[in-house]
């Protein structure tokens, strides 16, 4: 081996060690939450920091799994997530294909305007959205929250899928039309299968947003039976679970598991779906 190869090998090894340590550091809060959730001691911060629970118990998870409130909030969140993902993709995918393949007056200004509107933080539009939803009776109603979520994520979905459509060569569609395929057949049998990584990635991003969203959920949902998981966990932490951090930690870990499972199942689509959409978008 040459000196250059040795230096490159040492540098690559050092870089790998650095990223391993960095990953471990970022996992410390999660590992500590897992440790607290498995502990029978009711203490969150103590001088004897340890990742291994001293009084190991699964009672905290039993209280969470068999609690009626958690199940209700879980159902609410799943319903909101499924409907929001479906509506966002139903709106964004056709619009993204149109913006990618068609050239019409005002195309670029519309895209820039959508990005500008979506760049403001959610809290700035909170009062305006509340004033719009209240006269329609959509405050403390799941339909109102679905409209807010869909309007928020449809823009992101449009941009991400449009970027991926831009990477699909138009020659493929032209060749299919020469072979006698109609416009609908080109879209459904050629373009959509090729855009599958981007669509799945976009759907996953919308799902994660709805699952973790807190500001809108706590503002527009005032009834405890209509809380999402994020709003419900906050209400529990602020009330009866204030003195039971292990149960709260167990609840936090439990509600994260479904999204983690879906994420790992769809992980193979994430790289191509995000990078291609980000580069061309």
Regions found by a protein language model. Name each.
Residues 3-281:
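A structural signal for multi-pass alpha-helical bundles of membrane permease subunits
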